[in-house]
Amino acid sequence: MPNLFSPFTLKGITLPNRIAMSPMTMYNSIDGKMDDYHVMYLGARAAGGFGLVFPEQVAITPEGRTTTTCAGIWNDDQIEGHARVTSIIKRMGGVPGIQLGHTGRKGSELPPHKGVNEQGSWKALAPDHPQGWTCVAPSAIPFGGDHSYPVHPLTRAEIKALHRSYADAARRAADAGYQWLEMHFAHGYLGASFWSPLANQRTDEYGGSFENRCRFPLEVAAAVAETIGADRRQFFLLNNSYPPLQKPRLNMF
């Protein structure tokens, strides 16, 4: 590990070292906004020496959150809080990164500090719960387990709208000062659901073959690149298999 503490440059962005703080949900946002808590916590991580600092997965739409206390960047009012976060990270010598995502059929949960289910995991909320909503997915197939409420299968028009939501979120992230962009297409969230032949049983151009199941993530990447510039590096968090509950592991490819 001789290079762990040496600088690293990619696409004109230089990290002071190779140590990154991964996105970790903090459940401390109101209306998706970053505030003093996030400035303090993330600034301290940069001051402690992390070269690349991510907040949590940041939702591109209100329904893309895990809980109502998760961060978002779906409207311009949220830019100011994110700008405060990127400013303190840079001041402390780090590079601010952002992970954009949509939880898909794994959203609408109760914040963990508010209670868990009998298995000790996060508790999914019914769509008619005051803090819940109807989750969306490629097909009308719930994730299962606690997430067994009906989900809404996305229409083509809604898929196109999500392309725009990702692109607009990326534009806001750039305006807020983030220098490193990652897209969360793993862990059973929306992007991963499109990859998965278990979750995605569509019969149109977004389902069926591997090429069709790749279409949504690739269209998102293209929309983002068109908005913020193809010269800006995008990174993707992917997984090639996912163990849905008690089912055997399934190769996505």
Predicted regions and their residues:
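N-terminal amphipathic alpha-helix/helix-capping segment at the start of soluble metabolic enzymes
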Residues: M1-A20, I89
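Alpha-helix-loop-beta-strand connector modules within alpha/beta enzyme cores
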Residues: A71-P96, L198-R232
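Conserved, mostly hydrophobic/aromatic
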Residues: M21, R45, G49, I89, ...
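Non-globular sequence segments
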Residues: S87, V95, G101-R172
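Active-site mouth loops of central-metabolism enzymes
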Residues: M24-D36, T69-W74, T103-L110, G145-S165, ...
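Hydrophobic faces of well-ordered beta-strands that scaffold small-molecule active sites
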Residues: I19-S22, V53-P55, P96-L100, L181-M183, ...
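Catalytic domains of carbohydrate-active enzymes, especially glycoside hydrolases
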Residues: V39-T61, A176-W180
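Glycine-rich, proline-tolerant flexible connector loops at the mouths of alpha/beta enzymes
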Residues: F54-I79, L100-G120, E182-G208, Y242-L245
